[in-house]
């Protein structure tokens, strides 16, 4: 049996590509039995999504280094000293043959642990800019699966595979035919919703209708925000025109039914709307790491597949203008849909899966010891696992490793 570890999670932008690759690995293995084990944290949506699917999910006890201020950083850094040995025990127990990281809080520790044991390591970066975890892992990986050509410039050429964003099999091209009746809008703020979209989009739709546009909307609000958004639509006189839901389980079906999508610009969301082939108005999340959502959105805008509006410029008036313009221009919407579909890579999951299985069958590397961690937490981890060492030589982007004898 070949065991493939797929680590990441936290948001739908990680979880759904993880699922897509895992499903493709099992399909590609054919006569060779393949076990897919996902690794995430208790803080992410993977617990619910993968739990409902009955997937094999392991959880690491990881604290974030970003977003918690100085105290949060200190707690997360201290915890890192014990997370690496925890991840190493996990890799050993499962006898993993290859590890794939999508970044995030689980991806880094699992990849470092796998590499320390000689297990081949791959990263998958769906965004146009490498995330922090993948950027740090880049010097030690065997493969780097990317979706944007510009991402490759930050990676060793021999490792790069330009495969696109892995998607679940449900996402397929849906013919785009402008039709009579109301323009159907789909609002996606990501798996956790988007406060800014929850406020400005209903107001923009109300203004668009004042200008004569016939509009209907399905609005994904994120959990715990449904009631407030539903109340806002009612206040604006749109209760009969809006279907408000906290989370859309079948996004592929919702995209196929939409005429225009209003969304953030996470890579998975963009890959999904391109696979189905839908025009979009994109409002990138301005606080995404390295502002990667803005670059994602600009890539689609350059391809004439989307309208990109920075959040600071996304007033209800500006958004109403764009909605009304697209509502009045069915030919433009059709051209944008074709451009989006041309941007899609529908076989990414299968290509990643085939390559991962090839890595899994390859001979293992020579084992490496953990990088220097420093501090009390690292010394505690060293006491737990003799493999942890503070004697290390620098490699690449600050990662220190020592070959095990």
UniProtKB/Swiss-Prot annotation:
UDP-N-acetyl-alpha-D-glucosamine binds at residues 11-13, 127, 168, 191, 248, 293. The lineage of its organism: Bacteria, Pseudomonadati, Myxococcota, Polyangia, Polyangiales. GO terms for biological process: carbohydrate metabolic process; cell division; cell wall organization; lipid glycosylation; peptidoglycan biosynthetic process; regulation of cell shape. Belongs to the glycosyltransferase 28 family. MurG subfamily. CDD domains: GT28_MurG (cd03785). It is found in: Cell inner membrane. HAMAP family: MurG (MF_00033). Pathway: Cell wall biogenesis; peptidoglycan biosynthesis. One of its GO terms (molecular function) is UDP-N-acetyl-D-glucosamine:N-acetylmuramoyl-L-alanyl-D-glutamyl-meso-2,6-diaminopimelyl-D-alanyl-D-alanine-diphosphoundecaprenol 4-beta-N-acetylglucosaminlytransferase activity. Keywords: Cell cycle, Cell division, Cell inner membrane, Cell membrane, Cell shape, Cell wall biogenesis/degradation, Glycosyltransferase, Membrane, Peptidoglycan synthesis, Transferase. InterPro entries: GlcNAc_MurG, Glyco_trans_28_C, GlycoTrans_28_N. Cell wall formation. Catalyzes the transfer of a GlcNAc subunit on undecaprenyl-pyrophosphoryl-MurNAc-pentapeptide (lipid intermediate I) to form undecaprenyl-pyrophosphoryl-MurNAc-(pentapeptide)GlcNAc (lipid intermediate II). This is UDP-N-acetylglucosamine--N-acetylmuramyl-(pentapeptide) pyrophosphoryl-undecaprenol N-acetylglucosamine transferase. One of its GO terms (cellular component) is plasma membrane. Its EC number is 2.4.1.227. Pfam families: Glyco_tran_28_C, Glyco_transf_28. It is a peripheral membrane protein. It catalyses: di-trans,octa-cis-undecaprenyl diphospho-N-acetyl-alpha-D-muramoyl-L-alanyl-D-glutamyl-meso-2,6-diaminopimeloyl-D-alanyl-D-alanine + UDP-N-acetyl-alpha-D-glucosamine = di-trans,octa-cis-undecaprenyl diphospho-[N-acetyl-alpha-D-glucosaminyl-(1->4)]-N-acetyl-alpha-D-muramoyl-L-alanyl-D-glutamyl-meso-2,6-diaminopimeloyl-D-alanyl-D-alanine + UDP + H(+).
């Amino acid at each position: 049996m070949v065991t493939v570890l797929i680590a990441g999670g936290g948001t739908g932008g990680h979880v759904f590509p993880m699922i897509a690759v895992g499903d493709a690995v099992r399909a590609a293995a054919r006569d060779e039995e393949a076990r897919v084990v996902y690794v995430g944290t208790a803080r992410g949506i993977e617990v619910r999504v993968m739990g409902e699917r009955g997937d094999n999910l392991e959880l690491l006890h990881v604290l974030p280094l970003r977003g918690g201020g100085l105290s949060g950083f200190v707690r997360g850094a201290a915890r890192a000293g014990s997370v690496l040995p925890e991840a190493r025990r996990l890799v050993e127990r499962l006898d993993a043959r290859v590890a794939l990281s999508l970044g995030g809080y689980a991806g880094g520790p699992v990849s470092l642990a796998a590499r320390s044991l000689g297990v081949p390591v791959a990263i998958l970066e769906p965004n146009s800019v490498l995330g922090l975890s993948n950027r740090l892992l880049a010097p030690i990986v065997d493969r780097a699966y990317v979706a944007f050509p510009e991402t490759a410039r930050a990676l060793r050429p021999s490792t790069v595979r330009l495969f696109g964003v892995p998607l679940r099999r449900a996402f397929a091209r849906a013919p785009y035919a402008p039709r009579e009746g109301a323009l159907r809008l789909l609002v996606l703020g990501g798996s956790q919703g988007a406060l800014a979209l929850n406020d400005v989009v209903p107001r923009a739709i109300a203004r668009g209708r004042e200008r004569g546009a016939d509009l209907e909307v399905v609005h994904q609000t994120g959990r715990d925000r449904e009631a407030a958004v539903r109340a806002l639509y009612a206040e604006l006189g749109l209760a009969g025109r809006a279907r408000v839901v906290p989370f859309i389980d079948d996004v592929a079906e919702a995209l196929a039914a939409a005429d225009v999508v209003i969304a953030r610009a996470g890579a998975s969301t963009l890959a999904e709307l391109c696979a189905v082939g839908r025009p979009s108005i994109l409002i990138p999340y301005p606080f995404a790491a390295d502002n990667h959502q803005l670059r994602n959105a600009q890539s689609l805008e350059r391809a004439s597949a989307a309208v990109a509006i920075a959040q600071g410029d996304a007033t209800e008036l500006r958004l109403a203008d764009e909605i009304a313009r697209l509502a009045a221009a069915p030919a433009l919407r059709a051209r944008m849909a074709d451009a989006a579909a041309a941007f899609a890579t529908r076989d990414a999951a299968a290509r990643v899966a085939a390559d991962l299985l090839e890595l899994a069958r390859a001979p293992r590397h020579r084992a490496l010891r953990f990088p220097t961690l420093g501090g009390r937490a690292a010394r505690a981890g060293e006491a737990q696992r003799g493999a942890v060492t503070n004697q290390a030589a620098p490699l690449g982007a600050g990662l220190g490793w020592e070959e095990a004898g």
